[in-house]
């Protein structure tokens, strides 16, 4: 009889027996459901009897991090590994290497060779990898290697070009996908006693994590072993499998502590060139990006332009908001399955680029449109930027 049971401190007890919440969950599928009427009929504990579930406990990672024992991706090592330092192309997309002259690098002690990367996933284009016995040698040699490219179409695109395109998009009432469409914002604007319009811009933002991007890759027994810090393993493993023409089950990702993620390590694109180099050389390759290269290869938060139009009635109260924002969409490039559906069923949008515009305030007429800035999308790989 449920009335004879008591739930407290993570344990259900009664009739001389007890079962922890963890044991209940571990026993399998909890499929019991309740109708609204059944839920309403359930007794609710008075406030005086309510307690917090769980108890204070020490974070498991603090001792190792405090002592300097924690192993980050940058710390990972394997016997016989060599080091790789990238030389990135002038554009994220479309640049093709014409020639590589490494004659000035050959006298550098420890320099081995410079590789090109053929990535069928399309995320790494026009990159060269300088291989050396040590990372200092790889860094020094990368400054001596001369690479010439046929630059991609966006080589001359500037920040201002992207923002200008964004302004043009938000000023066009026919563009975008409806994220919110409550009431009739257009009619309220037409009938307003007063209106207010403002346009806002944000600039490109880099992640600049304390630990630059890195990856150590080894092929062993027909499997690709990747050692790196990562925030979304199931996002990069399919990309690696496509790029390497391998089965996903043969991509083994060993995850380490992050020296800062902030969304940059949601996508592990730095693993791609390291994996290709490790397979080409048949030995472990540790790729490390210096800060300048890490910045050039970053999946930046896109510049954005947002326009807000507000309408006010005769009483001075807010009667409508029309909000539109244009930016590059990370989800479109990296996780299109997570794109949201427009409220009218006409098109998809990146919720991470517009969330928050569907605010909790009561406005009788509220419309929000999300616009993909294609110029931004074609110029760089937009990324998620997260912080607290």
Residue ranges of model-derived segments:
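Alpha-helical support elements that line or immediately flank enzyme active sites
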Residues: 1, 83-111, 128-148, 215-281, ...
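Gly/Pro-rich active-site capping loops and adjacent beta-alpha segments
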Residues: 1-67, 122-123, 142, 146-157, ...
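General beta-strand structural signal in soluble alpha/beta enzymes
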Residues: 5-7, 68, 114-116, 196-200, ...
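N-proximal accessory regions
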Residues: 47-106, 124, 132-141, 162-163
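Conserved beta-alpha junction segments in alpha/beta enzyme cores
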Residues: 63-64, 70, 75, 185-244, ...
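Fold-independent oxyanion-binding glycine-rich loops
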Residues: 69, 89-90, 133, 192, ...
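Flexible hinge/switch segments at interdomain interfaces of large molecular machines
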Residues: 73-82, 208-213, 365-378
């Amino acid at each position: 009889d449920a009335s004879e049971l008591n739930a407290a401190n993570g344990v259900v007890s009664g009739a001389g027996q007890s079962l922890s919440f963890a044991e209940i969950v571990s026993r399998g599928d909890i499929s019991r459901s309740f109708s609204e009427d059944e839920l309403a009929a359930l007794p609710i504990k008075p406030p005086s009897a309510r307690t917090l579930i769980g108890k204070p406990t020490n974070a498991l990672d603090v001792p190792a991090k405090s002592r300097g024992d924690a192993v980050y991706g940058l710390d990972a090592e394997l016997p016989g590994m060599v080091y790789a330092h990238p030389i990135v192309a002038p554009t994220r997309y479309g640049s093709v290497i014409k020639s590589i002259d490494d004659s000035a690098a050959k006298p550098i002690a420890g320099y081995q060779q410079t590789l090109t990367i053929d990535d069928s996933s399309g995320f790494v284009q026009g990159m060269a990898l300088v291989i050396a016995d040590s990372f200092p040698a790889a860094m020094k040699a990368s400054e001596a290697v001369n690479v010439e490219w046929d630059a991609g179409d966006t080589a001359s695109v500037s920040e201002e070009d992207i923002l200008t395109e964004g302004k043009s998009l938000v000023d066009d009432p026919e563009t975008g996908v409806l994220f919110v469409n409550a009431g009739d914002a257009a009619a309220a604007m037409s009938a307003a006693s007063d209106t207010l319009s403002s346009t806002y811009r944000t600039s490109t933002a880099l992640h600049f994590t304390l630990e630059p991007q890195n990856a150590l890759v080894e092929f062993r027994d027909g499997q690709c072993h990747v050692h790196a810090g990562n925030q979304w393993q199931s996002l990069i493993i399919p990309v690696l499998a496509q790029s390497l023409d391998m089965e996903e089950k043969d991509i083994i990702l060993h995850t380490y502590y992050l020296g800062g993620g902030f969304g940059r390590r949601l996508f592990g694109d730095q693993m791609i060139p390291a994996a290709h180099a490790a397979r080409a050389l048949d030995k472990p390759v540790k790729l490390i990006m210096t800060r300048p290269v890490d910045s050039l290869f970053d999946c930046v938060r896109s510049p954005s332009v947002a326009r807000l139009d507000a309408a006010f009635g005769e009483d001075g109260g807010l009667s409508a908001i029309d909000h539109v924002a244009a930016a590059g969409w990370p989800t479109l490039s990296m996780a299109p399955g997570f794109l949201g559906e427009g409220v009218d069923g006409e098109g998809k949008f990146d919720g991470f680029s517009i969330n928050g515009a569907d605010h909790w305030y009561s406005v009788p007429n509220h419309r929000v449109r999300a616009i993909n800035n294609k110029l931004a999308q074609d110029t760089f790989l937009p990324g998620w930027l997260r912080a607290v």
